[in-house]
Amino acid sequence: MTSAVGISVPNTDAQSSQSASQTTVEQEVLKSKVNLLGMSRIELEQFFEQIGEKKFRAGQIMKWIHQYFVTDLAEMTNISGKLRTKLEQVCEIKAPEVVHRHYSKDGTRKWVFRVGEGSGSLVETVLIPAEDKTGSRKTLCISSQVGCALDCSFCSTGKQGFQRDLTPAEIIGQLWVANQSYVEDVPVAERTRAVTNVVMMGMGEPLLNFKPVVHSMSIMLDDYAYGMSKRRVTLSTSGVVPMIDKLAEELDVALAISLHAPNNPLRDELVPINKKYPLEQLIAAAQRYITKDGNESARKHVTIEYVMLDGVNDHPEHAQQLVKLLKNLPSKINLIPFNPFPHAPYGRSSRNRIMAFQKTLSDAGFVCTIRQTRGDDIDAACGQLVGQVADRTRRAEQWKKKVAERQEIIRSQG
């Protein structure tokens, strides 16, 4: 039978054969294996019904994958041997390949993943630990695209260009790997979920990969998976206004705006999408978002992200303009010291200037924090490590090409 999700299901009761035709069938089944990692509970329920099993198996599998971080079906003790045999032939549980992992002395962790077939493309994820009033907080910054099409002038990811959207398995796989890194040496029965917060602030614009991102966040919120609070899952956007309204209709998560400028001329320069959706439209969309459905818990305020660029957007008048812009929008402001990257056209604002900027906002009644710089020793700024890895890869390929050319010259001369 062929399911709606394109799964070829073999008859496990049929007698096995060593014929060439049977081998061909097995190869076709392997090609059609579906990855369960990125499937929602509803999709898993449909999957199990399509292979002739009960829907409750979906919850069992989700817990094994996302709460105990088990990918080997043989370790799933409440799944029968017969069902495991069937599943092994039609599905897999596969996270993105980790090509680099770096753990900073300050607790920050960073992974570079290869996604796609063959040599694939590179994306990265950063985990930032912190202490708060609830105890130890671990915030994971997740990527949604390979590269980014928005080309914000201060962002290293945008300089790499846009390649493609990530799939749900590639998005949720980042969360899976981060959690699994804390429990890989822990007995299965004692494993817990380490990541407490997720921010969709990594490589790419999440709202331009809308369906896979919303799908992945729904898995984060599912009690059979990560069971995260709506207030602890945040989507950050540079300002794709129509999709902010669509997000409000589909999912209740916290919203962050990558603002970075308090007026349209400057934001046009720093965040080019502002030319299409200027500040007036963006702020109005943010106001609609937090008032949707009676101001639910995840939507009491919007987080405003503001990177501090020396001599560009950090003057006293910029702080005053920001106060005026946000006066009717319940918001928390996060000032971000700029992380320079190779050939960056900007520098980081001085500590004194950042503190003065913060004081103006705080005096106006805003909650305003300064993001602590972490992971400097592992290039934890978004896009930096992927850029370095890609650069090393290009240099290695160029060197191999030169060696091959020299060898060809030597052979021709000999």
UniProtKB/Swiss-Prot annotation:
Ranges for region Disordered: 1-22
GO cellular component labels: cytoplasm
UniProt-annotated location(s): Cytoplasm
Residues reported to bind S-adenosyl-L-methionine: 204-205, 236, 258-260, 339
SUPFAM superfamilies from the UniProt entry: Radical SAM enzymes
Matches recorded under Pfam families: Radical_SAM (PF04055), RlmN_N (PF21016)
Additional record remark: Reaction proceeds by a ping-pong mechanism involving intermediate methylation of a conserved cysteine residue.
Domain Radical SAM core: 134-377
Residues that bind [4Fe-4S] cluster: 148, 152, 155
Organism encoding this protein: Acinetobacter baylyi (strain ATCC 33305 / BD413 / ADP1)
Biased composition (Polar residues): 1-13
Full protein name: Dual-specificity RNA methyltransferase RlmN
GO molecular function terms listed in the Swiss-Prot or TrEMBL record: 4 iron, 4 sulfur cluster binding; metal ion binding; rRNA (adenine(2503)-C2-)-methyltransferase activity; rRNA binding; tRNA (adenine(37)-C2)-methyltransferase activity; tRNA binding
Keywords on record: 4Fe-4S, Cytoplasm, Disulfide bond, Iron, Iron-sulfur, Metal-binding, Methyltransferase, rRNA processing, S-adenosyl-L-methionine, Transferase, tRNA processing
Annotated S-S bridges: 141-382
Domain of life of the organism encoding this protein: Bacteria
Family: Belongs to the radical SAM superfamily. RlmN family.
Cofactor remark from the record: Binds 1 [4Fe-4S] cluster. The cluster is coordinated with 3 cysteines and an exchangeable S-adenosyl-L-methionine.
Major location (coarse): cytoplasm
Catalytic residues, chain numbering: 124, 382
Role played: Specifically methylates position 2 of adenine 2503 in 23S rRNA and position 2 of adenine 37 in tRNAs. m2A2503 modification seems to play a crucial role in the proofreading step occurring at the peptidyl transferase center and thus would serve to optimize ribosomal fidelity.
Catalytic reaction annotation: adenosine(2503) in 23S rRNA + 2 reduced [2Fe-2S]-[ferredoxin] + 2 S-adenosyl-L-methionine = 2-methyladenosine(2503) in 23S rRNA + 5'-deoxyadenosine + L-methionine + 2 oxidized [2Fe-2S]-[ferredoxin] + S-adenosyl-L-homocysteine; adenosine(37) in tRNA + 2 reduced [2Fe-2S]-[ferredoxin] + 2 S-adenosyl-L-methionine = 2-methyladenosine(37) in tRNA + 5'-deoxyadenosine + L-methionine + 2 oxidized [2Fe-2S]-[ferredoxin] + S-adenosyl-L-homocysteine
Documented EC number(s): 2.1.1.192
BP-aspect Gene Ontology terms: rRNA base methylation; tRNA methylation
Cofactor: [4Fe-4S] cluster
